[in-house]
Amino acid sequence: DVGLRNAQLNFRQQEENHIMENIIYNELLIRGFNVDVGAVEHSERNENGKVVRRRLEVDFVCNRGNQRYYIQSAFAIPDSSKMQQEQKSLVHIGDSFKKIIVVRDRIKLWRNEEGIVVMGIMDFLLNPNSLEL
């Protein structure tokens, strides 16, 4: 709960990105999902040309019955490099379940070239069917 977190920290840290993640997490629980943090193994070449394995985090892996969604929480995506960073873990998931990035800004829901849905937090919260869009 965001209020309990803030009280525990004596209202010293107002990290909006963590608060947004907490809000998304609580909403997913309210909607009846089992929610976990996910990780994806990915190999890439470093600046020396050596192949290195990286572990990429998925903020939320949401399961309810036979439904599964992968969700990234991104406070802001000001440019294409930030978009690549946020979607990197999602594009390396080897299944066809829906992948979603939720951002703080009010934006029109859209689907990028990787098939990832990008939506604003208000659309996510106010529409109980937002994950189906």
State each model region's role.
Residues 1-133:
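A cross-kingdom feature that marks ATP-driven nucleic-acid transaction machinery
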